[in-house]
């Protein structure tokens, strides 16, 4: 009987030894929690011009150094499509100058006082 008792203890020890290396090597890692996504505040941009915004467009925008639909949309709180149309109008009136036209990005600048100087020093 005593010999059997020893064997049982050894069996218990060997089982414990088998479990230990698993815990040392990896162990159970904590499960990654989903982060709460950042909530952006809703942009309530104008779809059509009101008088005040239109006046602001005509006065201030031609003085910006870099004029793009994105910049105008952000500053005047108007939709991007409205900003594009407005800049086309300013261009046709000759208040701003086209720098680069791409299907996705149009860049204008203010009219330089000394005629058409090359617009190389552009702040992007």
Curated annotation (Swiss-Prot):
Q: Which residues carry this modification: N6-acetyllysine?
A: 42, 51, 59, 65, 93
Q: Where in the cell is it found?
A: Cytoplasm
What Gene3D superfamilies does the database record attribute to this sequence?
Winged helix-like DNA-binding domain superfamily/Winged helix DNA-binding domain (1.10.10.10)
GO BP terms: namely:
ribosomal small subunit biogenesis; rRNA processing
Location of the region described as Disordered in the Swiss-Prot/TrEMBL record? 1-37
- Composition-biased stretches (Basic and acidic residues): 1-22
Highest taxon, organism lineage? Eukaryota
- Sequence ranges of Basic residues compositional bias: 27-37
- Show the Pfam families listed in the entry: Ribosomal_S25
Q: Has UniProt tagged this entry with the keyword Acetylation?
A: yes
Q: Which UniProt keywords apply?
A: Acetylation, Cytoplasm, Ribonucleoprotein, Ribosomal protein
GO cellular component, alphabetical, reads: cytosolic ribosome; cytosolic small ribosomal subunit; nucleolus; postsynaptic density
Database matches in InterPro entries = Ribosomal_eS25, WH-like_DNA-bd_sf
Q: According to its UniProt record, where is this protein mainly located?
A: cytoplasm
**Residues recorded as bearing N6-succinyllysine in the entry:** 51, 93
Answer whether the UniProt record assigns the keyword Ribonucleoprotein to this protein.
yes
GO MF entries: structural constituent of ribosome
Question: How does the annotation summarize its subunit structure?
Answer: Component of the small ribosomal subunit.
Q: What does this protein do?
A: Component of the small ribosomal subunit. The ribosome is a large ribonucleoprotein complex responsible for the synthesis of proteins in the cell.
What PANTHER family is this protein classified in?
40S RIBOSOMAL PROTEIN S25
Describe the family membership recorded for this protein in Swiss-Prot or TrEMBL: Belongs to the eukaryotic ribosomal protein eS25 family.
Query: What is the protein name for this chain?
Result: Small ribosomal subunit protein eS25
Task: Print the organism lineage.
Answer: Eukaryota, Metazoa, Chordata, Craniata, Vertebrata
Q: Which gene encodes it?
A: RPS25
């Amino acid at each position: 009987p005593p010999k059997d008792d020893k064997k049982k203890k050894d069996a218990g020890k060997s089982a414990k030894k088998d479990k230990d290396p698993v815990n040392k090597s990896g162990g159970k890692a904590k499960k990654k929690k989903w982060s709460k996504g950042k909530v952006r505040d809703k942009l309530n941009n104008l779809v059509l011009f009101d008088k005040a915004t239109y006046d602001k467009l005509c006065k201030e925008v031609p003085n910006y150094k870099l004029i793009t639909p994105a910049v105008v949309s952000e500053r005047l709180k108007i939709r991007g499509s409205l900003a594009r149309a407005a800049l086309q109008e300013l261009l046709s009136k000759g208040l701003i100058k086209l720098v680069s036209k791409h299907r996705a990005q149009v860049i204008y600048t203010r009219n330089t006082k000394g005629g058409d100087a090359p617009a190389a020093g552009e702040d992007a």
